[in-house]
Structures are given as C-alpha cells and as structure tokens.
Amino acid sequence: MSNYYSKDDNAILEIDLKALSKNYKNLKKKLDKKVNCAATVKANAYGIGDKPVVKSLIKDGCKIFFVAHFSEAVRLRNYSKSIQIFCYHGINLKNFKDFIRYNIVPVTNTLQQVLMIDSLNKQKKFNKKIAIHFDTGMSRLGLDKKETKWLIDNKSKISNIKIELVMSHLACADQPNNPMNEKQLQKFNLIRQQFKKSKASLANSAGIFLNKKYHFDLVRPGIALYGGNPFINKNIKLHNVIRLKAKIIQIRQIQKNDTVGYGATFRAKRDMLVGTIAVGYADGINRKFSNNMCVSLNNKDLKVLGRISMDLITIDISLFPELLNSKKIVYVDVINKSNNINNISKNINTISYEILTSLGNRYKRKYI
C-alpha cells in the first residue's frame, strides 16, 4: 500500500538572514576598530543567493565585497552603486574598460597584469585603483617569488599605479598549529613593508580566528558568514544560516527482505514504512550520502535507505506509522540547526563549503 502527494513545493531552502547578520557582527567583534570586515560573496554567495545576502550585509555596515568572476562583480554593482567590489580573477586588455565602466577593483595576479595596468595608466586609459595578490605559499594565484622581487626592486617603474590593496591567501589557516601559517605571515609582512601606503589583507574566515596579527587592514570572511566552520578540528560558535526541507511525496510499506533503490544496496531486515522525498544528487545531495545520512522529522532521525538518486531519496519513516493514511503534507529536514552543513560534511569526508555551494537551483529559496 502507498500514498502519493504532489501539492506544494517539493523542497524549500530557507535562508536565515538574521543568522547571517549575527555571524557578520560576531566576526567584526573579533577585530580592532581600525580593521575592515569585508565579505566574500563569490559563487552566488556560496550558493544561497548574492542579492539578498549583499543587501543584508550592507544594512550591517559592510561596504567591501569580494567575488571571483567579473560577471559576479557586475551583478553586485547592479545591487549597489556605493559598495567597493574586488574581483579575484584579474584583468586583461579585453575587459579593462568594463572594470572602469562598473567601477570594479581588479585583483592582479601576475606581473604581466600589473605592467599592463601601468602601461594603460601612462596612456591615461585606466586611472583606477587595483589590488595586487602576492603568492606566499598557496602556489595558486598571485605574483610568484621572482615576480615579487622584480616588482619590489622596480617600484619606481610602476609609479603610475594606484595600489589600493596588497593581499595574499593562507593555505593552512584551517589548521591553527600548522607552521605554514607563520611562514606565510612572515613573508607577507616583508611584502607589506614595501607598500606601506596601501592597505593589506591576509585573513580569510579561519585567519580571523588565528590571531590579530593576521588581520592587517582588512579581513575577507566567506564560509563563516554562512554558518560553515572553516576549521578541521576546532569548534567555533556560528549561527546556522540554512535549513533545507524536503517533502515526502510517496509513502509505502515494504516487507522483510525487500530492497530499496538502484543496485539494491539496502535490504530490509524487518517490515518497514518508507517515504520518498523529492531531492537528490541533482540538487546537491551527494551520492556518498547513500545509506550514510539521516534526515529528521519532529526532532527524530530518519535513516536514508539505499542509494541517492538524481531526484529522489528514500527514508525510513517507521517511527511515524500514522503518515501512511494521512493526507497531510509532510516535510522532513535534510539540513537544519543540528544536522547542519558542518556535521553532515563529516559523513562523506568533505567540507561545509562543498555542501553549501552544491545546493541546486531547483529549491524554492525562502529568505527569513
């Protein structure tokens, strides 16, 4: 016997903007008054929606935002004409005019980009501020050792450039005792001394919690704003920002030895009542959660049975036999305050960043 329900939204992603605000304000409290707290809102604010996030943070006094792609920067500019926007992925001859048009600060990552800006300035084609990213150990983006040395030795050759910010990125800030943190700090301090008129930035979310000496003039939190713990083995107090609710769209009784899902990876050891919820790996619920996750209903954990499908997950609802003949629409919590992105990420040996940014576009997003 089974029941099938098809009304209302199949899955709802609730975003608590008040919790976001609390996280931002709590991060600011860890800083000296002279230190600016920017916000990293790349990847559509880590998947939860950059427009409401940016507007909420502006109300909290945030005036500086960081994104990865230029298209993201343009979107933010449409939300506000007054905020300062930095674009991590650099600048080139094809798009420099767009940086001027939208008043975006490019983060230059190579000596070639820096010299290009200098050349444009001499031609009076780019009279705008820039940021320079120096690689101090990440080996990903930024000027390498040779480029950094050349730039420092030849500062007089780039006198036309207005350097708003010098920055680097910590590779191991999520491990507070890793000696790499101190090594990068020392390298960055030496670089910063060569650009005293410019602001300096090193700390991401985890870097804020390391020590005030990592804060410099500007910090760039990302995941911590959204309730994600940036540390591997350290708990910090953050407010949960998201709640993911999925509707039970079908309920059925199965008997002992019946199997569930692709590959028949779950076999019932007893008669059970199972429900099917309308989310799957297409919505960002990783297949590694197959037989390896619980959702919750009325504060009771319900095990995931079998493999995660593209659009569906089957769960054990034997604790709620009254649901079988009920016409009530029932939602279960896939992610909530207790079963949050930090906790469930450990189940599949990943990080909260991946859980959050993977949440798909099919959810109805509700901002509260």
Give a label for each model feature.
Residues 30:
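Conserved PLP-enzyme active-site core in the AAT-like
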Residues 4-7, 11-15, 19-22, 35-191, ...:
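Active-site-proximal beta-alpha core segment in soluble small-molecule metabolic enzymes
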Residues 2-17, 21, 72, 91-93, ...:
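Active-site anion/phosphate-binding pocket segments in diverse small-molecule metabolic enzymes
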